[in-house]
Regions:
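Long amphipathic alpha-helical coiled-coil segments
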Residues: 64-80
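Short E/K-rich amphipathic alpha-helical oligomerization segments
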Residues: 24-51
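Short, charge/polar-rich alpha-helical segments
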Residues: 1-23, 55
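Solvent-exposed, non-transmembrane amphipathic alpha-helical segments
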Residues: 38, 52-56, 77
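Charged, amphipathic alpha-helical oligomerization/scaffolding segments
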Residues: 20, 24-27, 52, 56-59, ...
Length: 80
């Protein structure tokens, strides 16, 4: 029972972190779109931030899905 609570709390924290990172990524994404619309090369810094935030978001989503699958598996087997 405690393990299930712990996993749910981890999932909640990861979701909050993803939301925070998506907000930050949106800023760099807006700068990239602006550069494309103005037909200029985007700033290297904006590209770097966008790629860094996207990579971190993808990593966290993978971790969150693994935790959710663990909860489902434990629920099916009657564990936890």
């Amino acid at each position: 029972m405690f393990e299930k609570f712990k996993i749910r709390k981890q999932i909640k924290v990861i979701r909050q972190r993803i939301s925070f990172l998506e907000q930050k990524r949106a800023r760099s994404q807006a700068a990239l779109v602006d550069a494309i619309l103005r037909k200029v090369d985007p700033a290297d810094e904006d590209v770097e931030y966008f790629n860094r935030f996207t990579g971190e978001i993808d990593r966290l989503r993978t971790e969150m899905h693994e935790l959710e699958n663990q909860l489902l598996k434990d629920k099916k087997t009657g564990k936890v």
